[in-house]
Amino acid sequence: MKFETSTRRAVVFMLASILAGSLAVRAYAADKDKKDKTKPAPNKTIDSGAFGIFIKGQRVATETFHIEQQEGATVIKSQLKEASGGDSSQKSDMEISATSELLRYEWSQSSGGSLSVFPENEFLKEKISAPGAAKPTEQAFLMPAASPVLDNNFFVHREVLAWKYLAIAPCKDENGQRRCEPADFGVLVPQDRSSMPVRMTLVGKEKVTIRGAERELLRLNLHGDGFDWALWLDDHDQFKLIKIAIPADNTEVVRD
């Protein structure tokens, strides 16, 4: 798939932003700190909004999310609520370092139960607190801290993975353009207490109908054991995730 070099640069810049900036930016900030040590760097919103989750055309839930670049890290917060208006909800809170390594991940639900994931001795460990349990249980994963987290139902995690793929996918220059190959990732699914391999592939530009209006978006495919998803990003608006299609489940996720 051809991927224009200018587009590639934009994606790399986007990933640099979400990972708290390049070394040059940090060096500049350090020099500036010498002049004004008491002034902290302002937080920067990378993306925020909501995704509507539809099954067979009917809205069943809404995910609201916020991605913020803070000093030395990026925080990704999300909340999932049922469309029926009930009190049931889930929350996730993830923090990654400037080198794309997981610092912490936390999940909880209103009905009780929570979990956390954190690095320990160069690998990842998960701590699970089940409703009514006397004490939490722990599970170790022989995965590096740079492993992406793709937890159930939080689609903003797929947006972050798409940004990472577009920035690091194996590519080669051809006549001023880049042809990108698929990339494989080992990801962690905390709610399932499991890990799995996934592959992301750049398909290219497609015309997609979003709420009755036709838009040209950048399509990527996400494939894993037993699932195939299509993702569409707006390469004219910071590569924001606009839509996900999960045909096997009659499910669509659309940005509000």
What are these regions (language model features)?
Residues 24-28:
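Sec/Tat signal peptide C-region and signal peptidase I cleavage site
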Residues 13-22:
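Bacterial N-terminal signal peptides
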Residues 30-132, 167-256:
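Acidic, serine/threonine-rich low-complexity disordered tracts
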